[in-house]
């Protein structure tokens, strides 16, 4: 995988060292998706203690995704899902331009250990993620 800054991510190596959580966002401009990243960012101190890292998959142009990264200040790699190829392989597409918002927890074999599909302004799924990660101090 290559992120929007051109850095190469060895997913297998990453998953062997950390718990990898993939967050898919509907579009780079999605305000609810951006809110979720900001919510999770507020708990990074707890998540770091739980050995968790994140990857954010988004449709859209690099410029739009970079803007979303700037708005959220989410300090993890953002990956442009070109032609929604990754999302299609995970059955996470809404249409040809949008990804179904989801949270995926991968195991060390890159298999989905847990998933939460869907998101709205009343339901983000991050408390459920914290519970499955067994990270304490979640409000």
Regions found by a protein language model. Give the residues of each.
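Thiol-/selenol-based redox modules, centered on thioredoxin-like
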Residues: 100-139
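Structural micro-motif
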Residues: 73-76, 94-104
């Amino acid at each position: 995988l290559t992120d929007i800054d051109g850095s190469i991510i060895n997913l297998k190596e990453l998953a062997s060292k950390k718990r990898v959580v993939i967050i898919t966002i509907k579009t780079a401009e999605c305000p609810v998706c951006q809110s979720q990243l900001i919510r999770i960012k507020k708990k990074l101190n707890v998540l770091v203690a739980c050995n968790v890292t994140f990857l954010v998959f988004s449709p859209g142009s690099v410029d739009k995704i970079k803007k979303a990264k700037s708005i959220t200040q989410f300090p993890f790699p953002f990956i442009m899902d070109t032609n929604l190829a990754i999302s299609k392989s995970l059955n996470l597409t809404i249409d040809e331009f949008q990804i179904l918002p989801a949270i995926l927890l991968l195991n060390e074999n890159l298999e989905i250990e847990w998933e939460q599909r869907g998101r709205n302004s009343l339901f983000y799924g991050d408390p459920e993620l914290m519970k499955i990660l067994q990270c304490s101090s979640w409000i």
